[in-house]
Structures are given as C-alpha cells and as structure tokens.
Amino acid sequence: MCIRDRKSTAIKFFSEYLRPQHFNYVQLGIPTKWESSHWFQRWTKALPKEGEISFLDRSWYTRAITEPIMGYCNEKQYRYFMKKVNKWEEDLIKNGVELTKFYFSLSKDQQQIRMKARKNSELKYWKLSKNDEKIITKWNAFTLYKEQMFNKTATEISPWVSINSNNKMIARLTSLRYLLNKTDYEDKKII
C-alpha cells in the first residue's frame, strides 16, 4: 500500500502503532538533476515491497503543482508528467500496489494563521521556510494547478481523496477512517 500525504505529523499519526519493519517513511527531498529528468524512476525506487506500507511525505505530485509554480521544473517536464502519470499509476496498481491518494486541503485563511503561529512560536519557528511565504503569495496559481491535477489525474482506479484539514485532528481521523474502511483485514468492522 502506498499513501500520499502532505504532512509528516499526519504520517506519524498513521504509523505510530505499526511495526517498523512493515512500513517505510519516504521523504525524498530536492531531486538531483538526473532525478528531475527521470521523475517516475525516482519514485519507483521509493515504492513499497510486497506486504509493506509506504507513507510518502510529498509525492510524485509535486511535479503537478509545486514544481511548475515555483520554477523547479520546465513546461515540458510538467506536460510529460501530466500525460504519463495516470498510466504509470495504472501499471503500479496492476502490479499489486494499493494506492491511496490523500490531498489534505487547507483554506488560505487557515494557512495564514498557521504560518503566523509558526513564525511567532519559539517551538515551531523552524518549521517555516522561505518557500512557505512564497507559496502564500501564489495561492491563486496553486489553486489553478491543484484543480487541473484533480481533473486530469483522478481516475476510477486511482481517485483523489480530498480531506478538509483546517482542523488537524478531524483531518487525521477522517483519513484514518477512510483507510481502515478501504483496507481488508481480519475481523474488520466498518466504522
């Protein structure tokens, strides 16, 4: 199973009681020049082996939103990604990967509140990056690219699950409930 997530704290919530040998936390960071030109190969290496769960802090979908807006990829790379990603995911699923794509959505007001709280907190100031401040100024572009991503990459076998994350705990519980209901396991009770 492969889960796409945006926040490391949500991943911690999901994985807190899992046995460490059965899941991977994947945070790839800034791509090398080669990885930037071989986007799908970069992510293929990070996928789970049979019987494992991988939690992706960010995912291949940074190519669909963040990278083109921030100038980290060119138009050709963006278009190539958008053209190929559905088939790539379809192949993953045919080869046994159970893919769940969560998108944790945050309102602009809530994003600004959280950024201000981080900026003014002695415990959280380090979480605020220069990119965070740039991103808020490009909110409309992010919204446009996000909508394009949903429209072009939500498929019947690989839909997006959009979670309102203005309230962090409700978002985590909602996504966990979704995942538990979707997953088959012994003595399952639908919640």
Predicted regions: what is each one?
Residues 9-10:
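Hydrophobic positions on the alpha1 helix immediately C-terminal to the Walker A/P-loop
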Residues 19-23, 49-52, 93-100, 121-124, ...:
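Short glycine-/polar-rich loops that comprise or flank the Walker A/P-loop
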Residues 20-82:
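Conserved nucleotide-sensing/catalytic segment adjacent to the nucleotide-binding pocket
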Residues 66-84, 92-144, 190:
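A glycine- and Lys/Arg-enriched "phosphate-lid" helix/loop adjacent to the NTP-binding pocket
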